[in-house]
Amino acid sequence: MEIETDQSIEAMDTQDTQEVEILTSDLQQTQQQRNSPPQLPKFKNLIQPQLHAVGAVTQLPSENGNMPPQQLLADSSSTSFGDGEAMGIDDESKEDQFRSETTFSFTVENVVQLKSQRLSPPVYVRMLPWRIMVIPNDRALGFFLQCNGENDSPTWSCNAIAELRLKCHKPDAQPFTRARIKHLFYSKENDYGYSNFITWQELKDSEKSYVHNNSITLEVHVVADAPHGVLWDSKKHTGYVGLKNQGATCYMNSLLQTLYFTNSLRLSVYRIPTEADDSSKSVGLSLQRVFHELQFGDRPVGTKKLTKSFGWETLDSFMQHDVQEFLRVLLDKLESKMKGTILEGTIPGLFEGKMSSYIKCKNVDYNSTRYETFYDIQLNIKDKKNIYESFQDYVAPETLEGDNKYDAGVHGLQEASKGVIFTSFPPVLHLHLMRFQYDPVTDSSIKYNDRFEFYEHINLDRYLAESENTLADYVLHAVLVHSGDNHGGHYVVFINPKADGRWFKFDDDVVSSCRKQEAIEQNYGGMDDEISFHAKCSNAYMLVYIRQSELDRVLGDITESEISSDLVERLDLEKRIEMARRKERGEANTYVSVHVILEENFEEQHKRRLFDLEKVHPRVFRIKQNQTVDELVDLFVRGFGVSRQRMRMWNLCTAQTQKFSHFDFVAEGSRTIEQISTSQKPWVIWLQLAWTDVPGPLPPFNPKTESLLFLKYYDPRNKRLNYIGCTQQPHTRRLIDLVPDVNSKLGFEPDTELTIYDEYADKKLVNLNEPIESALFIPQDHLQGHILIFERENVDAKLDLPTVGDYFLDLVYRIEIIFSDKCNPNEPDFTLELSNRYNYDQLANAVAERLNTDPQKLQFFMCINNYKETAGNAVPYTFKGTIKDLVSYTKQSSTKRIFYQRLSLSIHELDNKKQFKCVWVSSDLKDEKELVLYPNKNDTVKGLLEEAAKKISFAENSRRKLRLLKISNHKIVAVCKDDIPLDTLLKSNESITTAQGAQKTFRIEEVPAEDMQLAENEFLIPVAHFSKELYNSFGIPFLTKARQGEPYGALKQRIQRRLNVQDKEWENYKFCVISMGHNADVNDNTPVDLEVYRSWTSGQLPFFGLDHINKSRKRSSLNFSEKAIKIYN
């Protein structure tokens, strides 16, 4: 298996290194049984065996004993090898060295006198050499199968099953055989078999006729899986490529292959608009990249960029996630990316089916029906023989009777039938087999490996309420398989890409063809027989079926012409850049990178110095170290289109001071780059080019008598420091003599007074009438590149930064800040360079100018630097501090980030409002979303709910009544009355903390119609979920109506209906009443005592507890880091 790492190191899958199973007591590894085993003999040292090539070997082995693959020919001729022969019998093409199975034999002569190990010539299966190995001992004959015996590499492995046979020379007699062997062959265990295959006494028994003319014939039938860690070309052998494993992402790889071969989905993914997306954060673009490489690439495809686009950290990628949850999250993300485009509706159009849940009373005319959609179906497999029994169990009606009667409102408790029926099935049907279920005995989730049959073709018409326009005939498209237990394991997928019966196995980076039996029957589970690669713990956990009538649409071929040319060009460019980087890394020792800076780079710099090495975009030339300076200059001539006479080279001596030394490429022309290049990597030079409006060559430069000066001008009105050119001046000239030339460059009057500064001296020059050499303190080593800054005298003092000194001081305080939209994470971030002395108004004006909006309709939030940077407290518009105060808590090297939010009202209007964050929960308790409301500061809960009603979409028949709840640690701690002032509510929320430090939130929800009116004997009681211990609470708590004295059985029935929990799952729930920290178990006949809930005065609000397993939590052995799967971008 190819492990995807930064170094692309190949290593074996951990699943592949599991212990092998000993099939019988005398079936052992030869390495453990031999006493001082000899080195594997080479063929030239053997007593030459005789070889009859019956579809096997026609030439002598090579010097090292290996038979080259090209020498495996279908030939009926024979070649003599001495006292033995090997025969290959292959039902498939005899020239196919990539075949998955074959039968071959080896005749051993002089067997009675056999004293040493014998090896047969190799026969190739899956591109690996397989040999029969014979090892005699005192009591019996040892018979082994060897794989790839000459290869000492630790990375290869191959899984195989084989039958070892001793042929009988009697007509129509059956060969002698032992139990089939099943083994993972790798470098340390490259042979497997029986050390005591048959005793000498039994072998020599003349009645059994095993020995004929002092010879025996041994035969092997071997079936091998595709090998890992060898040069296995999946594309060549199958036409498909695999996916690299990041360490524990085989669960994701199998699912991605399944989605890739859902061709209509793949085509829609190609068409997602991603032109403006950030390549590192776009899930759509990353999936496009993976699909495109799978379709057109020749090598296994990496997924690191995809998981990075998910926003996953390293730990997330190396954890085994729940596959069903990951599939749902990924499809939801794709569906959201397609909204608002022509692709909207693609996901439900492929995967969405519909069902109705019903309750029908037997004795009164009262029915309840609810219609739902689904993207997948969970089938119970426990105690079920096959897929039809599971579907029948899914739709089987349940009778509600006795203590479990249905509460039919005004009709009271009634006997009823309850069940579901499908109304339509989707084109692509995802079936999740419930291999992992809660076990009440162990009180944990376990994996069921029971045998469960599924079929290549199924019909589901009998499970529909009414027949659809086309038959519900389905063809099996993919079988996703898990090997292991509930703590982890390995995932592979078998796919029938064209639904034509040709199956392929996708095992991370290795793809191989396989038999239909291996893809289907051998994944039923409950087997550990001799004909299957799979152990008992290896079985199907998910099936993908495609509707027969939709095959052409779902599996239609996709050509490159159907993919956007812009996308193809972008992906090709990425690939070329990556290849160039790899090539550059590989040639780093033989090449030198020359970074060429031009004057245009100086013009981009408006700060100190001439350029910023971290931000400048130099022209890069790569040249071999043994090439000459003349050849480098020739590159410049061709690259810039200028003659040698119109260019001059300057070495950057130090990046810090940015001083240059003149490089005479004429004098140095014959020297090699290796001889003249500095220790600076890369080699940075400034290439001075003659100005296009100045004809002729550059004037000669004498570093002993001349100085190179760079000139800048400070523009106080635009607060910019502009580069205006360079000049070479004799040391004897005065600085004041430069003023007329500078005025001319700037278009000023010749007598305009200018002040001159030396940038490095960081002060105004006062000795302007002295020669340049003494005025600038030209050093003896003649480093060049003094920067002179000119500014006009008598500038308006009212300007923000009237002098260059003011400007430089401002630069000291400037920082780069990233601005992120708090409410819209998909909105691209932007960066502004601002002074950390800016006040709130200056900050708002700068951001508003960038966003082209009103600064009064922006609100800012400080950034919290936790696991992921998130928005913290809002910054009041009356804030008297500076930007420095907003970002000063971050580390010096950390990113400075501020969140912003666009407002629908002015920030001043907001001053009279109070921001109130809460959560809105839908009536089915499935959807949550954050609400940010702005009620008046002195408002009550009633005003808050009125404000919330403006932002909530109600159903047509809704009574539009809302209520506010306080939630802590997944429990309801208070039902807030309408007359409570919001100030009181918020202050009490801040002052109360729990022992666990649980965060309290407010929740707004619609009041159900049945809760509107409460009789004297009725009360709304809180309900909460927990697992085993009260502190392990989870999920969404809620209120439900209870009646004084009614049995808890009736209350539980109403809760089950509201939560839509299946009966079989509901049986695993436990129930108790929690009051004052104590819990009391209740049964169906226990009467409800409302005083327990009404008499609360302080502390935790009493609640009715549902104790059950937390299914939302992913299965992981690393409990400390368990969290739901999320795709952040």
UniProtKB/Swiss-Prot annotation:
EC number from the UniProt entry: 3.4.19.12
Residue span of region Disordered: 1-20
Limits of the MATH domain: 101-222
Group of enzyme by EC: hydrolase
GO MF term set: cysteine-type deubiquitinase activity
Catalyzed reactions: Thiol-dependent hydrolysis of ester, thioester, amide, peptide and isopeptide bonds formed by the C-terminal Gly of ubiquitin (a 76-residue protein attached to proteins as an intracellular targeting signal)
Function in brief: Hydrolase that deubiquitinates target proteins.
Full protein name: Ubiquitin carboxyl-terminal hydrolase 7
Originating species: Drosophila melanogaster
Lineage per the UniProt record: Eukaryota, Metazoa, Ecdysozoa, Arthropoda, Hexapoda
